[in-house]
From Swiss-Prot:
GO terms for cellular component: cytoplasm. Its EC number is 1.2.1.38. This is N-acetyl-gamma-glutamyl-phosphate reductase. Was identified as a high-confidence drug target. It comes from Mycobacterium tuberculosis (strain ATCC 25618 / H37Rv). Belongs to the NAGSA dehydrogenase family. Type 1 subfamily. Catalyzes the NADPH-dependent reduction of N-acetyl-5-glutamyl phosphate to yield N-acetyl-L-glutamate 5-semialdehyde. SUPFAM superfamilies: Glyceraldehyde-3-phosphate dehydrogenase-like, C-terminal domain, NAD(P)-binding Rossmann-fold domains. The lineage of its organism: Bacteria, Bacillati, Actinomycetota, Actinomycetes, Mycobacteriales.
Length: 352
């Protein structure tokens, strides 16, 4: 609970506040120490189709903000804030960002500014490329230096977050072949809150379903881009997403050919992650599970080698709404504002 107001507090707006990602951002902000001591103030809450409703109609768990009225998502409403989170479908953030001050910290949870290659963007999204911003996955090499003090942040996609954290240490150390396979299962909240037939309870409960396979999914080029950034070799990615009957969580199983021993691979992961507050490299013989990370900003990672098949296996579990979206957004905000990176974020899940 916020106890007092502080002069020159950082005023934060959330666009797309009625959606799952927007609601999760607000949940984390309500638990942020800067909110508790008044250094952070939650300003405008906006949405496109639910303007005029109260936030409590969409997120009854956010009781401190339940009475707040959702406003239209317009630059006139979002202007005047120190930081703006954009939790919007792709194609919407770029237009809004152009209308906001260069001094405003804009944290885009959509896809508009993630890809650096205009041709790749146009191929997968079918619209003009708006450019690229610093990538909000601090654990990647060099990412923190780009995020500190920036005023524009592109939050990674949820699947790429899991895949990149699972794979980059091995690839950066040149211990696996640069042709990787990623099979990732996800809860339905990753598809957003729109009412579609495929997400009805009767369609989801008791059923698992692959979708957008064979290089079609829009997160495929984002995974490849992130992996290419840590090696001087070209990287190919085969990505298969699978929807499972759960509300949250991603479990990514990533494989690649290797001739390196497990001891050498584990050493690469220990070197990459030993000082990372949100990464838990599991002991040998233990495997990640989504239930252990739900509600947290943690990523649980395990590595193994199938010696008969000469195949490296890395498994990562994250909460798609926290480390996969809102947690990465808040973590990146902390870095951009010069606050402790871990503020407002937990490594403790809520399992079972």
């Amino acid at each position: 609970m916020q106890n007092r107001q502080v002069a020159n507090a950082t005023k934060v707006a959330v666009a797309g506040a009625s959606g799952y990602a927007g609601g999760e951002i607000l949940r984390l902000l309500l638990g942020h120490p800067a909110y508790a001591d008044g250094r952070l103030r939650i300003g405008a809450l906006t949405a496109a189709t639910s303007a005029g409703s109260t936030l409590g109609e969409h997120h009854p768990h956010l009781t401190p903000l339940a009475h707040r009225v959702v406003e239209p998502t317009e630059a006139a409403v979002l202007g005047g804030h120190d930081a703006v989170f954009l939790a919007l479908p792709h194609g919407h953030s770029a237009v809004l960002a152009q209308q906001l001050s260069p001094e405003t910290l804009i944290i885009d949870c959509g896809a508009d500014f993630r890809l650096t290659d205009a041709a790749v963007w146009e191929r997968f999204y079918g619209s003009s490329h708006a450019g690229s911003w610093p990538y909000g996955l601090p654990e990647l090499p060099g990412a923190r230096d780009q995020l500190r003090g920036t005023r524009r942040i592109a939050v990674p996609g949820c699947y790429p977050t899991a895949a990149l954290l699972a794979l980059f240490p091995a690839l950066a150390a040149d211990l696996i072949e640069p042709a990787v396979t990623v099979v990732a299962v996800s809860g339905t909240s990753g598809a957003g809150r729109a009412a579609t037939t495929d997400l009805l309870g009767a369609e989801v409960i008791g059923s698992a379903r692959a979708y957008n396979i064979a290089g079609v999914h829009r997160h495929t080029p984002e995974i490849a881009q992130g992996l290419r950034a840590v090696t001087d070799r070209d990287v190919s990615v085969s990505f298969t997403p699978v929807l499972i009957p759960a509300s949250r969580g991603i479990l990514a199983t990533c494989t690649a050919r290797t001739r390196s021993p497990l001891s050498q691979l584990r050493a690469a992961y220990e070197k990459a992650y030993h000082a990372e507050p949100f990464i838990y490299l599991m002991p040998e013989g233990q495997l990640p599970r989504t239930g252990a990370v739900i509600g947290s900003n943690a990523a649980h990672i395990a590595v193994a080698v199938d010696e008969d098949a000469q195949t490296f296996v890395a498994i990562a579990a994250i909460d798609n709404l926290v480390k996969g979206t809102a947690g990465a957004a808040v973590q990146s905000m902390n870095l951009a504002l010069g606050w402790p990176e871990t503020d407002g974020l937990s490594v403790v899940g809520v399992a079972p």
